[in-house]
Amino acid sequence: MITNMTKAIQQIMLGTVTKNEKQAAESLKRIKAAGYDGIELNGFMIKPTSFLVRMLTKAAGMPVGKGGDYDWNALVKEAGLVVTSIHEDLGTIKREPETVIREAEKFGIKYVVITGMYRF
């Protein structure tokens, strides 16, 4: 029986409610108020991405916007949440494992989840 479970949401679910940093902060606070403890960050939503990636993800129903410009570490902490993991595409993990590890360490986490696809 699990007795100490962290309830978290995936950042990719928040694309439409994180159009600017203020809206992202408000959304994260609402997530905390709804009973969540944490968030799984998405690698291509916490780093600046190209226009093409933003358009492809938007067309796929997963708008990522310009969230890569936000200070996600501060936003998550201010909302009282924790980062549970980062999910990253397999191509980036294979090409830049040390960069992915440093990113995880920056957020104080030890888990990186593979999205199962290569970056666009």
Residue ranges and their predicted role:
Residues 1-111:
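N-terminal pre-domain/capping segments
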Residues 113-115:
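Short beta-strand elements of ligand-binding domains
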Residues 117-120:
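Surface-exposed cleft-lining segments at the edges of enzyme active sites
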